[in-house]
Amino acid sequence: MRFCTLSDFESLVPAFATGAVTFGTPSTVFYKYELDKEESSFNDDPTPGSNKGTLYYVPAVTFILSKLDVAKRNEMQLLAKNRVVAIVETREATPTYWAIGVTNGLDLSTGVAGSGVAAADLNGFTMTYMGLEPNPMVNVSSGDLAGITNA
């Protein structure tokens, strides 16, 4: 999973066509996190505007980062203070990549940093980012992803 601020994402000069995004200037730094299996998720729920004939999307990204440390704490604080864009990877035989929050960004909805009681309990962060978008998530090619700098 990768995150950057919405303003940094916009500086990539994103171009949208046929449900995909390409980057004109892939120089923005994304924070990249390798997540444990079966502990993170994303969804992009289409939501009709009742009788108004409108449709919008409510994206949500929830992820868990194991182990508390100062570097992660500082990054979580930076991301929490900004509107962000997330790029997520699916768990398929051939993974696909999706950018979420590309128009309005995602805001921190809930965040928890702490340790559990039992030896097997989480010692780390659980973060949920949510947004409100006019369009669904967009595909990111592996070629464009390769051009992104990861922090």
Segments from the language model and where they lie:
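Solvent-exposed edge beta-strands and adjacent loop segments
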Residues: M1-A60, G105-A120
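Short, hydrophobic/proline-enriched secondary-structure or compact coil segments at domain edges
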Residues: M1-C4, V61-F63, N82-R91
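Generic structural motif
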Residues: L6-F9, E38, S66-V70, R91-A93, ...
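Oligomerization/assembly interface segments of phage tail-like spikes and tubes
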Residues: G49-V70, D121-N135
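Exposed beta-sheet edge/beta-hairpin loop segments within beta-rich domains
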Residues: A71-A80, G114-L122
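Short, acidic/charged, Gly/Pro-enriched secondary-structure junctions
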Residues: N74-G101
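Mixed-charge, glycine-accented linear interaction segment located at domain edges/termini
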Residues: G105-A151
